[in-house]
A protein has these predicted regions:
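DNA major-groove recognition helix of helix-turn-helix
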Residues: 39, 49, 68
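A short, Lys/Arg-rich alpha-helix, primarily the initiator
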Residues: 1-19
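Key DNA-contact positions within bacterial/archaeal DNA-binding proteins
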Residues: 22, 33, 62
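Recognition helix of helix-turn-helix/homeodomain-like DNA-binding domains
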Residues: 30-44
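Short, charged recognition helix plus adjacent turn
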Residues: 12, 18, 65-72
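DNA major-groove recognition helix of helix-turn-helix/homeodomain DNA-binding modules
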Residues: 48-63
């Protein structure tokens, strides 16, 4: 059975745009640890936070996530 899992691409976009975790944390008013957890997909940002992330990173919301398909 094929399944999909969604992972955020925040780390990838930060690297592409040469933006630091510290800068993103300051812009969003969250800790650097929170950004680190998002970048490793340990936790996920809320919907309002995703909107703010897309604004700060100047990217579309759809670019913040990717689907990973696998068989279970």
């Amino acid at each position: 059975m094929e399944k999909k899992e969604y992972r955020n691409r925040i780390r990838v976009i930060l690297a592409e745009k040469m933006i630091t975790n510290t800068y993103l944390a300051e812009q969003l008013g969250v800790s650097k640890m929170t950004i680190s957890r998002w970048c490793t997909n340990t936790t996920q940002p809320s919907a309002p936070q995703l909107i703010e992330i897309s604004r700060v990173l100047q990217c579309d919301l759809k670019d913040l996530y990717e689907a990973i398909e696998y068989y279970a």
